[in-house]
Amino acid sequence: MSSYAWSAVQDAPVEVLFPGIRARPLWRGPGGAQAIVLEIDPGSCWQGIDVHDPGPEEVFVVAGTFNDGIRDYPAGSFIHAPAGSSHVPQSVTGCTLFVFYPEG
């Protein structure tokens, strides 16, 4: 078990990406893989287009309702965004996401 890595969201540093949108990095692995918690306040929207490059993005909606610029995803939803795809992350009600980038 000594090879396990763990972190608590409340102890993770807060990186403000845009007004009302914060990232809390939980883990970074070899090759750039990373896991983060993304917090989007009610009425907040990503500035510009979020392009998934070099690899895919895996999203699990932990709480609230996430919108990718096209549709809503309620809590409990899983989203796989393939490499090269894009969206505009936002939320009317606010949401918390677990985001995993297997390739960075």
Which functions belong to the PLM regions below?
Residues 1-36:
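A short, N-terminal "cap"/entry segment at the start of jelly-roll beta-barrel domains
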Residues 3, 17, 45, 72, ...:
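Intrinsically disordered, low-complexity N-terminal regions enriched in serine/proline/glycine
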Residues 19-21, 83-104:
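Ligand-binding loop in jelly-roll beta-barrel domains
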Residues 22-54, 67, 71-72, 82-86:
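Conserved short histidine dyad/triad with adjacent acidic residue
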Residues 59:
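Structured binding elements
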Residues 63-64:
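Glycine-centered positions in the ABC transporter ATPase nucleotide-binding domain
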